[in-house]
Each structure stands twice: as C-alpha cells, then as structure tokens.
Amino acid sequence: MAEGSFNNPQIVPIRGIGQCDAMLEPILLFIVAAFLLAGFVKGVIGLGLPTVSVGLLAIAMPPSRAIAIVIVPAIITNIWQTFVGPYLRDIVRRLWPLMAGTAIGAWLNAGMLTGPYARYGTIFLGFLLMIYAAVGLRQFVLTVAPRHEKWVGGIVGVVTGMISAATGVQVIPSMPFMQAIGMEKDELVQALGVFFTVATVALAFNLSTAGLLDQTTALPGVIAMACSFAGMAIGQRVRTRMKPEVFRRWFLIAMIFLGVYLAGAAIYKLYAPA
C-alpha cells in the first residue's frame, strides 16, 4: 500500500506552493473529517473534541501520534471555553486539587506513550471509550459532600492524569466528579474548559519531553485546529434546531461501537498468529 495510507500513516510535508497533492494525502483528509466531526460534537453538547478525535485518529495511527495532533486544537478551544463565563475564580478555588492531581498523575505516568506498554494504548483507549459511553448512557447520579471535595478531587485528579498520559482522554473520572459536586450547567461548562486546559497543558509537556511534538505534527495540527472551529460553529448552529439529549445519546452509542472496534482490532493484531 502506498505511503501515507491508513496502514502506514505518515504526514508528508508541503514542498512548494504549487504542490497541493500533499494536501490530498489520505491521512490528511481523514484528519479533516475527524476534526470536523469532533468539533461538531463539541459545538452541540459542549465537550468531546479530544475524546472523539483521538478515538477516530487511533483507527489510522498510534494513539501517541493522534494525541500529538490533537493537543494544539484542544488547548486553544479549551482556553476559549475557560473565559466564557463569570465563574473562573470560584472554579479555581473549588477545583485546584483536581487540577493539581491531574498534573501529578500525568507526570507519574509520562512513559506510557513511548515505553514498553505503548503497544497496549489502543486497547486501553477502546475500553475507556466504552466505559465513558456506558457511564454517560446510565446517567449515574453521584454526590460528593462539600467537606470531601478537596481530598476526593485530588485522588480523582491523579487517576485522571494517569489515564490522560496513556490515552489522551481526560473525561474519566474527572467529569463524573465535577457533576457530583453540584456545579450548575453554565458553571460546569466553564469548569470543563478550565480543567481541560490544565490537563492538556500537562499532557503537552509529556509529549514534548518524549519528542512527539515536532515539525511532522505542525501541518496536521493547523488543519485540525481550523476544522475543529469550523465543526464547532456548525454544531452550535445545529444545536438550536435539535434536541441535544437525543444527539448525546446516539453519540455515546457510537462511542461504544468505536471502542469495541479499536480494542477488538488492536487485540487481534497483537495476538493473532503470524
């Protein structure tokens, strides 16, 4: 199969102004589609950009490469979400143990993307997507008393950081925790932006240290960021014409199927006889 195909994904640099054929590389077209869809999901339900994009890109490349492409769009969109609302000071006061724990957890598990267990990353990602979707579909109602927020948040943060360092996904168990402490809808949306900004910056530090952020991710990163904002704009417009809960349900069901495919294909590839 030709270079740049899904079985051997490589980012081919643009060599000159008139040479637009590199833009038509299948992997770049796949990145465009993945981030348009991920941005659309974020525009409709307010989250899901890294989860969807990493999950889709993992079909065509190792999770470490997928995360390196996702990192810049994730940081930019989360910074934007951080400052949309008046709750920033209260969010930092309540969630600093969660954010500090996430940074520590990401640092503790920094070697997962490049170490001897990196080959299991796609399997772990697949199972994590299934868990994330199942929790969302069941809509578990959990509560954490205010007096326990700090220490529970710290533990949840460490676990989230370790999972993030291995898969790039930061919603488990951080999001159920933020829902459990009783944040209102608008405050929760802004809190997700604040938390994901910190978590993504911590992950970016891991990627940079491991040498995964280099010039080969520059072009895909720019394309991904543009497509993310385009998808978000479309999703925000569509949100007024559809029921977000109905869309969210079908989105989570699709995440289960994606998780099954990723985990199943990776296990087969890892253990199938030569």
Residue ranges and their predicted role:
Residues 91-101, 122-126, 147-157, 187-194, ...:
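Cytoplasmic-side transmembrane-helix entry/capping segments in multi-pass membrane proteins
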Residues 32, 71, 125-129, 133, ...:
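Residues within membrane-spanning alpha-helices of integral membrane proteins
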Residues 27-28, 57-75, 119-129, 158-168, ...:
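Structural signature of hydrophobic alpha-helical transmembrane segments
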Residues 78-86, 110, 124-149, 236-237, ...:
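Transmembrane helix exit motif
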Residues 69-118, 201-246:
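Selective hydrophobic functional segments
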Residues 90-93, 115-129, 139, 241, ...:
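Loop-to-transmembrane alpha-helix entry segments
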Residues 18-60, 142-192, 199:
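Selected transmembrane alpha-helices and immediately adjacent juxtamembrane segments
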